Amino acid sequence: MADTKQKRVVVAIDGPAGAGKSTIAKGLASRLGFIYIDTGAMYRAVALWALRQGVDSGDMHRMEQLAMAAQIELGPGTISLNGEDVTQAIRTPEVSNGASKIGVIPGVRRAMVAKQREIGERTSVVMEGRDIGTVVFPQADVKIFLDANPDERVRRRYQEIRTKEDPPPISQGQLAAEMKERDMRDSTRADAPLAQAPDAVYLDSTALSIAEVEEAILKIVRSRVTNGRDFS
């Protein structure tokens, strides 16, 4: 846990799907003693609720209502929605696609950003998503834009799906098409599009191991945030 007697620190990790944000952010948070915040999981939780309620993702008013009413709690490696553990339920292609669609709705984004800021203003965090360094915490102490080439991102995401469902419910070709569409939607949406913050460090993880990426980011944190802390 972060030491509340010291200045809280925000490490923002942005990037497209499949770049390795979640894996890296979890490991980094553990090493730093910070709280890990998966903002994408928050959007997924709202998308799951919408699917269960039969609410069309295009119904902006209803989606905004759901986002504002959703009781989302994040724990170590878990997420609950209205008191129910939905950690596994949100990790399906259908929910992932829905999350990307509702992520372009301004009212939904406002509700999620408010929840994310409230967490980050309480304690030190490693927060990953698509607009953390540009919108949620533009004054983050450390900003990383984590990327990988499209083929590698598809391969990683497909392997992730296969570990949960074998045979997977989607082919690798279908996943590639969905991810390409999502990349386009995320980078061209009018409200908080996926973009590298001007002061973010760009890191291509295509040919790097998890340990190598973690160490590279940890080195950046050490150089920018001393604050009497020992980031070993």
Curated annotation (Swiss-Prot):
The keyword Transferase applies. GO terms for biological process: nucleobase-containing small molecule interconversion; pyrimidine nucleotide metabolic process. One of its GO terms (cellular component) is cytosol. InterPro entries: Cytidylate_kin, Cytidylate_kinase_dom, P-loop_NTPase. SUPFAM superfamilies: P-loop containing nucleoside triphosphate hydrolases (SSF52540). It is found in: Cytoplasm. It catalyses: CMP + ATP = CDP + ADP; dCMP + ATP = dCDP + ADP. Its EC number is 2.7.4.25. The keyword Nuclease does not apply. Keywords: ATP-binding, Cytoplasm, Kinase, Nucleotide-binding, Transferase. GO terms for molecular function: ATP binding; CMP kinase activity; dCMP kinase activity. Coiled coil: none annotated. Residues 164-192 are annotated as: Disordered. Residues 178-189 have a biased composition (Basic and acidic residues). ATP binds at residues 15-23. Belongs to the cytidylate kinase family. Type 1 subfamily. NCBIfam families: cmk. This is Cytidylate kinase. The lineage of its organism: Bacteria, Pseudomonadati, Acidobacteriota, Terriglobia, Bryobacterales. The gene is cmk.
